[in-house]
Amino acid sequence: MTCVTPSPGCGSVEAYDGRRSVSSTLLSRRDLRFLLYEWLDAPRLTERPRYAEHSRETFDDVLDLAERVAAEHFAPHNRAADTSEPVVDGGRVRMIPQVKAALDVFAGTGLLGASMDESVGGMQLPHVVSAAAFGFLQAANVSTAAYPFLTLGNANLLLAHGSAAQVDTFVRPMVEGRFFGSMCLSEPQAGSSLADITTRAEPQDDGSHRLFGTKMWISGGDHELAENIVHLVLARIPGGPPGVKGLSLFIVPKVLLGPDGTLGARNDVVLVGLNHKMGYRGTTNTLLNFGEGVHRPDGRPGAVGYLVGEPHQGLAQMFHMMNEARIGVGAGATALGYTGYLKSLAYARQRPQGRPLADKDPTVPQVPIVAHPDVRRMLLAQKSYVEGALALVLYCGRLLDEEKTAPDPADRARAHLLLDMLTPITKSWPSQWCLAANDLAIQVHGGYGYTRDYDVEQHWRDNRLNPIHEGTHGIQALDLLGRKATMDGGAGLSLLLETISATVSRAWKADGEAAELAAQLGAAVDRIAGTTRRLWATGDPALALANASLYLEAVGHVVVAWMWLEQLLAVDAATGAAAGGAAAGGDADAAFYAGKRQAARYFFRFELPRTTARFDLLDGLDRTTLDMRDEWF
């Protein structure tokens, strides 16, 4: 079916081509095979004890399962979750039933614990494989997928910092999908300024605490999708240090548990209201009061909470979850950009309009709009953004596997440092440029893209959250330039630049087009090093950080150019010809590899040059924004 006029069903993914499966417009399995098996060599991880029970076949089975669940249970209600968002009814959240039905199916697959230890009910899959599998769910319905992914972050934090009893009590039910999780940081008066959090936690004789305060912007903070919600809450124990050093982390369940783990009384956590959002509408976003006295455990006000680890270590513990969440944000942004690209590509191949410039005969049939150069430009830009972003997300997944399982402790430390350095980039670059891909997907659809008859406008609205939550674009920029680039004497930045330079050296030796692109990338690496030195040589942090967002964007573009050069080298290895050649596997493989080459060319010719103007402004220590005054606006 070709949706050239609005009609019922044109908003569904099936509308793009009745002969294609829903999953064909979520993510590209061919691209995932290339990234996992031809570039990142994921099967080699099965040589390590943690992953010894797995094989490429089990990896493919997991991808098949995730793709099927996404297509059959998540995608069908994506539009309904957007148009019929959750509401508060009698103090309880009501939402469309398809959300819980889909999450029950997902819980039954065991995928929520895909990369967790078998001892807590997990599958012990490599993180790079689980990241690829989860991409299907995020592409199909990012708001429904948010509930288990928030839960996954909670569970991983407690595995890292919780006691054995806390793991048994709370993590196992989360892995089983019976309990879900939320992360409660922000407060109405504090926003992103965690130093200004005022929620207090009063110690009790039994070792627990009673929490009093208000939390804002809490995704998944209340719903009826699971038996219980495990809130992880930052709060202050009276008498602690001021600022972020005085924050402690607490487990605050929505429903208290008995000694045997059975559900008991309601905790003193109250839903005040829901925030109504531009996108991500199927995910509840809540204002919660802790200790209001509506529910009175043991006859007293105060939300019962259990300290995680030691007092005043809450921020460090929460950043364990935050770093994971930030990479997850980048993964979600990538998935939304990717599905938008595939849908606009399918539309462009089917939508007839216009004729070639050389043929003005009105009796000649119109051509599909994919034949027009400007449409190809928009599609190629999207391809370069989303496939570059997916490579970056999966590369980070591979680094996490190295950090956890590399035989050499030095390799583990190196992977940890490199992942730490890449985290703000992996969060921010896909959030900015896969959103730009969604914008182009709308443009490819023309006027129809601006209507709700097609999915692409919703993808843009959903994706617009990603530059904001889990640390805004500006906060990531300050983190990269103000902390990551200078920590340990610049060790993280040095490692990143050395790693990129190693790829440049390999490409030089490969000769041909790879060597040509390597020269460009090598020059860009030198700009990063020189610009960073110049900024901090001023001795003025305010001046050095005034244009931190430009630094983040420039370094991000260089990193994604690196991802494209890595992919080009993998294509060369697969085809056996640095200058391009036929590949085993027939015409489909040949077209795939040719598309990779062309996308790499596009990124180096159209995108990497963008960094020059940014580096020039940074090198010039431009004060335009710093010197601007409030009264001049």
Where is each model-derived feature located?
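C-terminal amphipathic alpha-helical interaction region
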Residues: M487, T503-F633
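A glycine-rich, basic-preceded beta-loop-alpha segment at the flavin cofactor/substrate interface
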Residues: W217, L257-V272, K277, L287-A325, ...
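Alpha-helix capping/hinge segments and adjacent helical runs
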Residues: S23-L26, P203, Y280, Y395, ...
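Internal maturation/activation junctions in enzymes
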Residues: P86, Y147-T151, G162-Q204, G397-H416, ...
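A short core secondary-structure module
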Residues: S208, F212-R266
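Conserved phosphate/anionic-ligand binding catalytic regions in large, soluble enzymes, centered on
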Residues: S115-P126, S143-A145, G330-G337, Q432-T451, ...
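Amphipathic, small/basic residue-rich leader segments at the start of a protein or domain
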Residues: V13-A145, T169, D616-L617, R623-F633
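A structural-propensity feature for long, helix-poor, extended segments
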Residues: L152-N154, S163-Q166, F170, E470-T472, ...
